[in-house]
């Protein structure tokens, strides 16, 4: 089905301004999903924040209970010893210090997540211009600077997603694949929303979770009725 036909199919199925129960919203998306690859299911959450204010920017990470459906390659900066061994045991593809930094500077950047122990940041700091633009720079706010690298690796590989408000105060995140069953997608979305609520800035006023929309990789969004979700 051509993308234009897919968009039209969803547009016909969706009533303007209507919010759908989660299961109905997902059904609409899956019915119109005809791509030759397994599409992702994405969510856009409009928050009641002023993203222009530094104290109202929302950033963090969530471990999705049903995972993301993606294979994640992890590199860890940790000094030789217990912490490095812990990271390797958890499944990290690469662990090191200056040697790992040199490999990255030489072009080895085939990683989805880069983690560092606090005492390794002196090495990682030199890679800011390399890792920063790729979204790979370790940051304590999203759990990628950690004194427990083994746990951080396990989280990354078991379905951890990072989120950050854009200029419009919207969070964009993937909550799984179209091949996931509805309950898995729902549990992932609920986990994300609960963590967003926990991360609510103290200065945010009014309705915080203003709008939740789900979409497939190639399709438009369908608004979700939040009362169909368990957010307590």
Curated annotation (Swiss-Prot):
GO terms (BP aspect): regulation of translation; translation
Matching Pfam families: Ribosomal_L1
Keywords: Repressor, Ribonucleoprotein, Ribosomal protein, RNA-binding, rRNA-binding, Translation regulation, tRNA-binding
GO cellular component, one term: cytosolic large ribosomal subunit
InterPro entries: Ribosom_uL1_bac-type, Ribosomal_uL1, Ribosomal_uL1-like, Ribosomal_uL1/biogenesis, Ribosomal_uL1_3-a/b-sand, Ribosomal_uL1_CS
Molecular-function GO terms, alphabetical: rRNA binding; structural constituent of ribosome; tRNA binding
Domain of life: Bacteria
PROSITE patterns on file: RIBOSOMAL_L1
Sections of the chain in a coiled coil: none
NCBIfam families in UniProt: rplA_bact (TIGR01169)
Main function: Binds directly to 23S rRNA. The L1 stalk is quite mobile in the ribosome, and is involved in E site tRNA release.
Protein family: Belongs to the universal ribosomal protein uL1 family.
Complex and partners: Part of the 50S ribosomal subunit.
Protein name: Large ribosomal subunit protein uL1
């Amino acid at each position: 089905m051509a993308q234009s036909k897919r968009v039209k199919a969803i547009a016909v199925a969706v009533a303007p301004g209507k919010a759908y129960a989660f299961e109905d919203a997902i059904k609409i998306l899956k019915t119109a999903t005809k791509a030759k690859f397994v599409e992702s299911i994405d969510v856009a959450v409009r928050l009641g924040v002023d993203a222009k204010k530094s104290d109202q920017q929302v950033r963090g990470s969530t471990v999705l209970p049903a995972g993301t459906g993606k294979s994640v390659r992890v590199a860890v900066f940790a000094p030789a010893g217990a912490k490095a061994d812990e990271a390797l045991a958890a499944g990290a593809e690469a662990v090191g210090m200056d040697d790992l930094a040199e490999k990255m500077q030489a072009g080895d950047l085939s990683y989805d997540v880069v983690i560092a122990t606090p005492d390794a940041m002196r090495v990682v700091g030199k890679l800011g211009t390399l890792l920063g633009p790729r979204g790979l720079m370790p940051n304590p706010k999203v759990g990628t600077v950690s004194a427990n690298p083994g746990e951080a690796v396990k989280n990354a590989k078991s379905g951890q997603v990072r989120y950050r408000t854009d200029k419009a105060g919207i969070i964009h995140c993937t909550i799984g694949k179209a091949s996931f069953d509805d309950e898995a997608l729902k549990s992932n979305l609920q986990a994300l929303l609960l963590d967003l609520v926990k991360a609510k800035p103290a200065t945010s006023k009014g309705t915080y979770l203003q709008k939740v929309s789900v979409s497939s990789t190639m399709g438009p969004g369908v608004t979700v009725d939040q009362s169909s979700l368990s957010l307590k």
